[in-house]
């Protein structure tokens, strides 16, 4: 009887864990930060009238993706001129706005490129607290039950040059954010309880971008990046994966100590979130000459320059690399033994994740900034013109559905239960059978 009871308790606990993961979408790209969901029963087809439970207009201009915890949805927004930065909470069941709270006034906003907005970083959420950042203009933690601001920071200086894009992530007692500006480049961990700085680590790459007068080329534009960190367990240890301009870094997330890095100086302006599977780190390298790389993680202290031959005996290496159809803004998605990506111009590709062999490439049409979602054997690709193309994730290309909503997507999808939450440029939609 005791063994049976323990087994039953264990099964209930595992079932509850699965349900929690299905219901909560706690950060950019979901519970694992890789755009995959364990949910089943998501709709295949929809329109403005079919399989729509509700839709709610969202004021301002913002590309942040929604996060979900329990019965709440949180997202950020900003006025078009960037002078007012706000956070919103919606009721998941009804779509009604619970809180619409202006957090920061900005007297002199930095420039934001048309591909960007003044509220592009997505929040991070856990039980009782939500964390939002707008980059240098401000970072804050709010109580999700009262909407009260628990702490905020406005003292972090960084010239985002074309706008901030790096979303915060949670790990243990830390909130971790990339700051890759034209003037300074670093990764920073906040104590999530107090907002105080736990550690700060400057990027270590020599950009080699000084002209003959010692001035930084292009006003530091090539030092910019917009990526979001990822936590991976590598050889039994937690590793913080952080893509900066011209280099992929691995850090100890507890201390910020750099473990290894891969340098690629021919590219710049990367905006993807790295992922880890099959013992490999997958990332792309941004504008100019973008690569999709599968990196074999290295030992502490190892450095690899992609343009040079790896030192003999070094563990850190490029397992495979391609320049074909590599996205600059949308992040790749690993599903089983396959990796999928759509480039900014609408060509989707599938490769074998372990070898880089191309399985298929097909034009979906439109332009893409949102990262794909993988769930229940399908991939959902949302473009800037408002179309979502659904294809199988088994390695055989077929357009299962093509759905359209007005105004287009810059934000990536979120999932809770059997519902899709899609943020267009003007509204948030709950799509459900």
Question: For each of these PLM feature ranges, what is it?
Answer:
Residues 7-15:
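Bacterial N-terminal signal peptides
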Residues 18-433:
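Noncatalytic, solvent-exposed loop/strand surfaces
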Residues 1-7:
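Bacterial N-terminal signal peptides that target proteins for export
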